Amino acid sequence: MGPPGNDSDFLLTTNGSHVPDHDVTEERDEAWVVGMAILMSVIVLAIVFGNVLVITAIAKFERLQTVTNYFITSLACADLVMGLAVVPFGASHILMKMWNFGNFWCEFWTSIDVLCVTASIETLCVIAVDRYIAITSPFKYQSLLTKNKARMVILMVWIVSGLTSFLPIQMHWYRATHQKAIDCYHKETCCDFFTNQAYAIASSIVSFYVPLVVMVFVYSRVFQVAKRQLQKIDKSEGRFHSPNLGQVEQDGRSGHGLRRSSKFCLKEHKALKTLGIIMGTFTLCWLPFFIVNIVHVIQDNLIPKEVYILLNWLGYVNSAFNPLIYCRSPDFRIAFQELLCLRRSSSKAYGNGYSSNSNGKTDYMGEASGCQLGQEKESERLCEDPPGTESFVNCQGTVPSLSLDSQGRNCSTNDSPL
């Protein structure tokens, strides 16, 4: 089977419809079709609505236009295409128990399916590398990976995904040679994705397993560094809260800078966890299908068709999960609230991401930590002066970010992932 496989050669039979023996059976079949149609419609709407919201938020609010969020946009585009051009036709294939759109659209639809899943996993792999660079070279990150370079990387991801999907499918390199497959290829109402063993294994390895291994390896390194930095934060805060009052007074402002640096680090670790959840969810949703994909070409009678369809749709549902995961980020959460008119804003809104909250204070989009005007104690403010070089070194190895307070001053120094 091809990597992201469609409802494929395990789809419900296409060579005839089942004639029920009793009216009760017929009613059950009709109820099943109606129930599945409603469920699949909800899935499609969730995928389309959620990912349109993500793309719109990043396009509208400058606060979200970071290098990593460029990759998030690419991921959302892949999910959106999945929701518009793949899932609806897959639902029709199941509910109608036959393919109604001809041979050309069958192969084109299959190519889009492979394209979207390949682009998704490769984009997640790129995000992992992006975070690795941010951790190992936090002061060189902005020069190493600019927005223009990010656009080029995204373009390359989609080109490679297109070559992996459209080229072998449209050139018929994927086709099997046994009679059942040949009959399906020539039948207008059959769109079962029969593949030869070489294509099934090679495409699964290139499109899924290799990027997955790279992603897991790189991200494990990222978390190792992040864990060490959290331990440094704990030790630093332990020294700051020492019972020796003389030491605290002696440390003075340096202790305050250390605390601000620690808060910054903890915020970025939460963003790192959000990216980890996105990658983990994608893996959990698609890995079972790709395991079955390999097993099937080795032993085609081992996996029941119902299991295959279920795992395929588990992968489809992943496209609806990511917008929900992004809600962990204050940046995205506030942007979504603005777009859905769930957050009160002043009559004067700025394209750079500023908005006024219900208290009349000006927040920078996404900074839920309190970067706002007000009479706060010096020791409790996050957004005053950027952490000094000495204190920021304690945070080296975390995800760099850029955030501003209401007066436009830097709270930190680099780009923000989420």
From Swiss-Prot:
Residues 59-71, 130-150, 221-274, 330-418 are cytoplasmic. GO terms for molecular function: adenylate cyclase binding; amyloid-beta binding; beta2-adrenergic receptor activity; norepinephrine binding; potassium channel regulator activity; protein homodimerization activity; protein-containing complex binding. It is found in: Cell membrane; Early endosome; Golgi apparatus. The gene is ADRB2. The modification 4-hydroxyproline is found at residues 387, 400. Its main location: membrane. GO terms for cellular component: apical plasma membrane; ciliary basal body; early endosome; Golgi apparatus; intercellular bridge; mitotic spindle; neuronal dense core vesicle; nucleus. Glycans are attached at residues 6, 15. Disulfide bonds join 106-191, 184-190. PROSITE patterns: G_PROTEIN_RECEP_F1_1, G_PROTEIN_RECEP_F1_2. Residues 394-418 are annotated as: Disordered. The keyword Flavoprotein does not apply. This is Beta-2 adrenergic receptor. It comes from Mesocricetus auratus. A motif (PDZ-binding) lies at residues 415-418. SUPFAM superfamilies: Family A G protein-coupled receptor-like (SSF81321). The modification Phosphoserine is found at residues 261-262, 345-346, 355-356. It comes from the Eukaryota. Belongs to the G-protein coupled receptor 1 family. Adrenergic receptor subfamily. ADRB2 sub-subfamily. The chain crosses the membrane at residues 35-58, 72-95, 107-129, 151-174, 197-220, 275-298, 306-329. Residues 1-34, 96-106, 175-196, 299-305 are extracellular.
